[in-house]
Amino acid sequence: MTQKEKDLLLRDLCARLPYKPIMQIGNCGACNLRGIDHDNSAELRDRAIVWNGQYYPSSTISFPMIDCKPYLFPLSNMTEEQLFEVQEILGKNEIEIGDGFLHIIDSCRNTITYLEILALLEWFYKNHFDINNLIPMGLAIDATGLNIY
């Protein structure tokens, strides 16, 4: 993992902390992310796990960021209901969302305020969508069909 990738993952996970993202740790099971330490290690909880041959009971455990991957949904998997929620946040009649773009169709209002942008980002983080393209980079796991959230 390059420093640039590590920084991107760290920024993404910090924004997701209030929404309890589920993480894959190495080849262990899924755990809830509790916090990120100043040394860029992830703190996990809610599950006893085995890591590097050692057993850790259910408690707070720190792991290097390189071993942690969040479970996220690609934007292309957004349902019609979710798209409607995004339209309500932006106050737009019709929008189209793809991986990496937001296209506003048929709208008489051509501006988006920074408060709408912040609300939209919060919605994406809360619903565990991959808005930073971590999945194609191998920094996150596609949660489609896993029924993990």
Task: Show which residues each predicted segment covers.
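Structural boundary micro-motifs
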Residues: M1-Y149
